[in-house]
């Protein structure tokens, strides 16, 4: 399969109802995938500790969020600290991309990584993650 790459500019869900992207692992639909969402500390999200790209790892093969190593729905925290899973805090400025750590990519070898819960490669890579006003830009390879 040839890798496909495309660039996106995401508005907030409040401003752009179609502003959430689903990125399938392996480029084909299945029970494990990523959702990309622009979250800004304004409006209904004014209490967020930071703004940027939320990368959600979804695994519909899981029934709940009781296994902190393989949640049904888990936020891939840009800082890689896993503070949410370890109940260290309720979120911090390093959780969304690029975040306080200025992390502009997410892939199989990054921390956190885009690997599947079984450790296999998903083929998903995000690069060029940046913020411009209330929008988030990202290039997606799948």
What are these regions (language model features)?
Residues 2-142:
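Non-catalytic C-terminal accessory/binding modules of secreted extracellular proteins
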